[in-house]
C-alpha cells in the first residue's frame, strides 16, 4: 500500500525565493489585500508570484462555511470593507496585470452572498485598467436570489465556480453546498450572458471513483461550461480530509482526453492544476479556441 503521508515526486515544487516573489508579497501586504494563494496554501504560489500573477480574495478572510478540503479560516466573518474595490484596482494597476483573478470566501451572512461587492470590484478595475481582463471565482450563492443576475450584469470576462468534487462526497467534503445548485449557477450565468466564458474545476484523490469523475465532466458540459480544470487534492493540515489517493500524471492525461471529447473549449488536468494556475495564458488560449470553433 502506498504511503500517502509522503508526496510523490510529481507533486513537489520549489520553495519561493525570487525577488519578484517578495516584491509581489510586499505590494499585497501594503495594500492590505488577502490572497487565496496564501490563505489556501497553494503549492504554485512561488511560480505565480514570481510572474506577478496572484488571485486576490475579497469579502474578508473568514468563511461562513467549513469545507473539509479548504485551508481558509472559518467562523464569524469580517465586516465588509467599502474601500476594498479601490485598493484592489490600485493593486491591479501597480502590478500591471493583463489578467486578474478575483475570488472570495463564502458570505452566507450577506443578503446577496457578496455578489454586489464582486460587481463593484469589477467596475473599479474597468475604470483604472480598462485593458485588463477579469476572471472571477465565486461561491455558490446558495439561496441568494438575484445574485447570478448581478454577476452576469457586471460582465466579467470569465466566470468560474468550482464544483470541487463528485456528488457522493458532498456530505463529507463540501457539506454546506449542493452539487446541483453549483451546476445551475454555472448554467444560469451562461444563459444570462452567453458572451461570458464559464469555467469550473474539481479535485481528485478524495476517494471518488473514475466513473463519478466522468459523470461530473458530462454534467459540466451539459451546463455549457467552456473550461474545465482537474487537479490533485492536497491535505492542507491534519485537521482536513485525508488524501485517499495520489492520482498519477498518466491518469490525469486520461481524464483530459475524455474531457476533450465532450466539447469543452479548454481542459487542464494535471496534479498541480488549480483554478487560477496559468489563468493569464489560459485565457488567451480560451479566446483562440473560441475563434477557431466559430470558423470551423
From Swiss-Prot:
Subcellular location, record wording: Cytoplasm
Disulfide bonds: none
Main location: cytoplasm
HAMAP family: Lipoyl_synth
Domain Radical SAM core: 49-265
UniProt-annotated binding residues for [4Fe-4S] cluster 1: 37, 42, 48, 276
Cofactors that this protein relies on: [4Fe-4S] cluster
Organism domain of life: Bacteria
Protein name (Swiss-Prot/TrEMBL): Lipoyl synthase
